[in-house]
Amino acid sequence: MGETEGKKDEADYKRLQTFPLVRHSDMPEEMRVETMELCVTACEKFSNNNESAAKMIKETMDKKFGSSWHVVIGEGFGFEITHEVKNLLYLYFGGTLAVCVWKCS
Amino acid sequence: CLLFLFFFQSLNMGRGTRKRDEDSGTEVGEGTDEWSQSKTTVRPPDQLELTDAELKEEFTRILTANNPHAPQNIVRYSFKEGTYKLIGFVNQLAVHFSQVGNLIPKDSDEGRRQNYRDEMAAGSQESVKVVLSDTENLEEDEEPKEAEAEAEAEAEAETGSQIDVPTVEAVETVPEEELMTPRQPKERKLTNKFNFSERASQTFNNLLRDRDCQMEPPPRTNFSATANQWEIYDAYMEELEKQEKTKEKEKAKTPVAKKSGKMAMRKLTSMESQSDDITKVTQAAKIVERMVNQNTYDDVAQDFKYYEDAADEYRDQEGTLLPLWKFQNDKAKHLAVTALCWNPKYKDLFAVGHGSYDFMKQSRGMLLLYSMKNPSFPEYTFSSDSGIMCLDMHMDHPYLVVVGHYDGNVAIYNLKKPQTQPSFRSTAKSGKHTDPVWQVKWEKYDDMDHNLNFFSVSSDGRIVSWTLVKSELVHTDVIKLKVEGSTTEVPEGLQLHTVGCGTAFDFHKEINYMFLVGTEEGKIYKCSKSYSSQFLDTYDAHNMAVDAVTWNPYHAKVFMSCSSDWTVKIWDHTIKTPMFIYDLNSAVGDVAWSPYSSTVFAAVTTDGKAHVFDLAVNKYEAICNQPVVAKKKNKITHVQFNPIYPIIIIGDDRGHVTCLKLSPNLRKMPKEKKGQEVQKGPAVEIAKLDKLLNLVREVKT
C-alpha cells in the first residue's frame, strides 16, 4: 500500500514538476525569460543527453548574446563560478535537473 | 639524356628540300583527304616558274642509311700486313643536332637520386637558403651528396653513362637543371621545362605600429551553489506549496467560496480587526488631542467657567465681553463666516458655514463643526465647490445640517456618515434656486408623513419648502415674492411682476403657518404658508437690504430686524411701525435675541463691533459696545448666543470665529428683593417686555 502510494507520489511529483524553477538569476527580465525558455527547450529535446542539451544552450546563447557562455546541466553538482554580472541564470527543471548558465569571457 | 639523330640523303638536295617544304602539307592532303578540304596553294613570291612538263617530271628520292659525305676511300697502314690497305668499313654516323634534355625518368637512378636530394633539402635546409643559393653552390652541394650516395648507385651511374654519348656536353646543362629542381614544390611534381616560367617582384612591407588602450573589464561576481536531488525536490515542493496558498487566497477572495468559507471568514475578520485598529488609534489620538488642548487652553476654560468681571459691580449698567477661544482653520482661510449655528443637543458644538459675501470673489465653501473642547481643530470638515451662505441644524436630529449655497443649491450633510459629500442635494432638475440661498431653516414640525422638511429663501424671490422623501429632496414653492405696486399690465392681459429678493426669514414660534421674510428692498413681509399669492402684512422696514429678521423667543408678537442701513428695529407684528430703532453707525450684519432674557439681544456691525442691548436696563443705547476683532478691516458677519452658557460666538469675514463671554451686567436678572422669591419663566419675561412695549405704544398712541 505504502509502496504504491510512494509510486503515485513520485508520478505526481514528476507530473507536477515540469515547470522550470529559477533559483537564482541576475539577468534582465527579458533575457531571463528567453534563456529560461531555451533551457526548457534544450532539456526537453535532449531529455536523455545532458551534454547535448548543454551544447545546444551554450551555442544558442553564444549566438544570441555574444560569446563565452558556459552551461552546466546535471542532477547533482556543486560549483563556484565567476560570471559577468547580469549574466547568470541558475534554475531547476523537470524535478531532477539543475541548469546553470552564465557568461564569462 | 635523349639523343636524336636524323639522316637525310637526297639525290638533289638544292631543289629537293625546297620542294618538300612546299608540298609536305598538301601532298598528304591530296593523297588521303581530298574531299574534306579545298586545295589552297600558298606560293612564296620568289617561287620558280616551272612549266607543266617540268612540274610533271618525277624525281626519285631515296632515303638511305649511308652517309653520302662519308669517305669511301680511307686507306690506313696495316702493321700486320705491312702495307696500306683500303678500309671497307666506314662509320656512317653523322651528328647534325644535339640537345640535352632535363627530364629524368622517375625510375632511373638519377631520378631516384634527385628525389632523395630534394627530400634531404626539404628536411634539413631552410627554403630561403635553397632559393638564394647559387648554381655553383648547388654544384658543390651536389657533389658531396653524390659522394654520399650509395656506391652501387654510383657504379651503376658510371656504367650507365657509357650509353650516353654526350655526357661531357651534358655537364653544361646540369646547373640549370639543378637550379630548377630545388625550387619545385614538395609534392615532387616535376615542372614542365618547356612552358614553365617564373616571375617575382618585391614590394615594400607596410610599417607596423602598436597602439593599445586599457578599459575596465566587465564587472564580475562569484556565484556558488550545490545542486543535488534533495535540494531540487525541496525547492519544487516549496514552490508548489506557495502556489497552493495563492490559489487558496484567490478562493478566499471570492465570496462564493463555500468550503474555504471559514478560512475566508477568519481572514476577513482579521482584516476587519486591522481596520478597527486604525479607528482605535484615531479614538486614542482624539483623546490625546483633547487632553493636549485641555492643557493648552486651561486658562481659557477656567475663564469660561468661573471668571466674572468684578468691575461690573462698579460700572453700573454697562457690561463687557471677554474673549475666550478663537476658532480658525487653514483650509477656511480667507473664507468669510457666512453662517453660525449652535448644535441643539451638544451645547459645546457649533457649525460654521464659510463662503463669501463678495459678489466678485466667489470661490469654494466649507462647512466646519467646532467644539469648545477642541478649539484648535474642527470636529467635522466638509468642502463644497460653491460657497455656503447659510445653515441650520435640526432640533430633533442634531446630526442633520442643512446648508444653502451661493449657486442656489441646498444640501443636507449627515454628520453620522463619514462621507465628505452631502447626503442630499438639490439639483437644477429638482427646483434649486437660481440665486444665492440666503437662509435655510428646518421646520420644527414634520409633515403628516413624518418626513423632515425645511424652508429656504433666495434672491430669486421664491420661498421653497423642501421635503426629505426617502432618498430625495422634493420641493414645493411656498410663495413668490412680488414687489407691491410693481405689477405692470401688458396688452395680452398678462401680469408681469418684479420679484422681491428674499434675504432672511423666520418662523413664528407659536403660530405655525406664519413667518416673516426680509427682502433686499428693505421690506419685510408677513406671510402664511397657506397663501402663496398674498402677504398677510408688509412692513416698510428698512432702506437697504434686510440682513436678519428674528422673532423674540419669549414674546410672540415681537420681532427684530436689522439691515445694512445701519439700523436695528424692533417690531410688534401687529403694528406697522417699529417699536424701537437703534442706529449703530455701521451696517448691521446680524442680530440675535438672547435665550435667557426677552429684553437682551446682540447686534454686530461691519466696523468690527459687537453691541449688546438690554432693553430692561437701557432702552436707548447698548449696554455693551465693544470692538471684538483685532483689525479694523475685519468685518463681523454673524453672531449667535449659546443656548445655555453666557457666551456668544462671532464670525468675521476672515474666517475666524471668536467666542466671548458676557459679563454679569449683560445678563443681569431682576434684583432679588428681600423675602420675595424671584419669579422666573417665560411669563415673567413676556411681562417684562410687554411693560416696555406698553411704554412705547402709549407714546405712539
Curated annotation (Swiss-Prot), chain A:
GO MF assignments: identical protein binding; microtubule motor activity
Effect caused by changing residue 35 to I: In MRMV3; uncertain significance
GO terms for cellular component: cilium; cytoplasm; dynein complex; microtubule; plasma membrane
Subcellular location: Cytoplasm, Cytoskeleton, Cilium axoneme
Any single Pfam family the record assigns to this protein: Dynein_light
Coarse class of the protein's main subcellular location: cytoplasm
Keyword Nucleotide-binding annotated: no
Disulfide bonds: none
Keyword terms: Cell projection, Cilium, Cytoplasm, Cytoskeleton, Dynein, Microtubule, Motor protein
Gene Ontology biological process: microtubule-based movement
InterPro entries xrefs: DLC_sf, Dynein_light_chain_typ-1/2
Keyword Isomerase in annotation: no
Family: Belongs to the dynein light chain family.
Disease (UniProt): Mirror movements 3: A disorder characterized by contralateral involuntary movements that mirror voluntary ones. While mirror movements are occasionally found in young children, persistence beyond the age of 10 is abnormal. Mirror movements occur more commonly in the upper extremities.
Subunit structure: Consists of at least two heavy chains and a number of intermediate and light chains.
Function, as annotated: Force generating protein of respiratory cilia. Produces force towards the minus ends of microtubules. Dynein has ATPase activity.
Protein name per UniProt: Dynein axonemal light chain 4
Organism: Homo sapiens (Human)
Species classification: Eukaryota, Metazoa, Chordata, Craniata, Vertebrata
